[in-house]
Amino acid sequence: MAETHAVLDALRAPLDAGLELDNTPGAFLASIFLVRCARNLAAVLLLCETGWAPEAQTLLRAMVEDMVTLSYISTDPEQLPLKWLRFENRRLPDAEQLLAAFSGQKMPEREDQPKYERWTRLSFNGMAKRAEKVVPGILEYLRYVYPILSDRAHGNTSASSMYMRVYPDGTVEPLYLPSGAQSEITLCNAVTVTYTTAERVKALGVTVDLGPIELAEQRIYDACGLPLELPEELAD
């Protein structure tokens, strides 16, 4: 888990030093996702260290969603950040207030009940498909991990082996105590998602040193004995 701590330290470094970013909506939006990624990674790491990896996978699912969303947004850094900030998220007027403060513009008037509008008509898979041109392989990765993580989030029966163990004699053991099961694979995926998110954050104009994150990603996969790329039979 030392490698994951190294990733978290690298992710926090620009936050500790004070964010440096371009004066654009894309960079502003990316900085929000960077903070969220750092917080979620810290929470996933804490849960895995204390034996709650299946629960950490619910947070990992949120990290995957953010990775896909930001990757899609980065395909059109001029328009999509504004759509994200001004449409669906008008339910949160603080977003536009933060943007105004960041860019030195006049503070917008708050609306008591801002109108809800979708910022994109694309499905989640549709966003991932569009993001392929900036993050090759993101759609296949999403198809590989997202159903598993959704099982954890929604408690589907296919995830029941994480909560109950049935023995040949009919004995049922409730698995309610912490254990180290699935910690390594959870952290491996969390680091991969973090690297991709950080790379997109940098592409949108936020200063992030990707070197330590990339190195830690390789080390954690080596330590787990896992390939960094999807096996060919899963990538087809």
At which residue positions do the language-model features occur?
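A cross-kingdom marker of C-terminal helix-rich interaction/assembly modules
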Residues: 1-236
